């Protein structure tokens, strides 16, 4: 039995999501149509609203429904003087869930990748440079991913910050909590050794 073109289109559309292949998309579509049509309509409505109403914070570039996100609009966070640079909005969420950081963020929406046509301008580094030159920041915390591109991006931003005599730090990378050394790759292990602390 062949599927209708609308079903096929819907399954294909769902595959734009990360980790969703043909089988997962098929299960989702058949579940929503067979068991949860009300949920499907609610999902459709919320997706449409989100796409139309959620934009980027004018200061840090994370997702928000307002001109400024709740963090940038918080005077206590702004007075802290620390700014944490991350690659994606989901990284802000991950750090916020630790409840350890009380400064502001700057979201790059990617990393430097000249081969893909992603340079400083595409990452909004002119906006970051303007913020750093304002004299309101005492420390830049680099929290880009520990990839070649992430490290290159971190280095580029560190050089920017040093022009304004701002302290620059990099989040530690190493062995995960609960991890076993035999399963840790050599690059991660070398980062762990070079970033070791007194016990």
From Swiss-Prot:
A zinc finger (C4-type) spans 57-72. The keyword Endoplasmic reticulum does not apply. GO terms for biological process: DNA recombination; DNA repair. Gene3D superfamilies: 3.40.1360.10, 6.10.250.240, RecR Domain 1 (1.10.8.420). Keywords: DNA damage, DNA recombination, DNA repair, Metal-binding, Zinc, Zinc-finger. SMART domains: TOPRIM. Residues 81-176 form the Toprim domain. InterPro entries: DNA_Rcmb_RecR (IPR000093), Rcmb_RecR (IPR023627), Rcmb_RecR_Znf (IPR015967), TOPRIM_dom (IPR006171), TOPRIM_RecR (IPR034137). One of its GO terms (molecular function) is zinc ion binding. SUPFAM superfamilies: Recombination protein RecR. Signal peptide: none annotated. The keyword Zinc applies. Belongs to the RecR family. HAMAP family: RecR. May play a role in DNA repair. It seems to be involved in an RecBC-independent recombinational process of DNA repair. It may act with RecF and RecO. This is Recombination protein RecR. It comes from Psychromonas ingrahamii (strain DSM 17664 / CCUG 51855 / 37). The lineage of its organism: Bacteria, Pseudomonadati, Pseudomonadota, Gammaproteobacteria, Alteromonadales. The gene is recR.
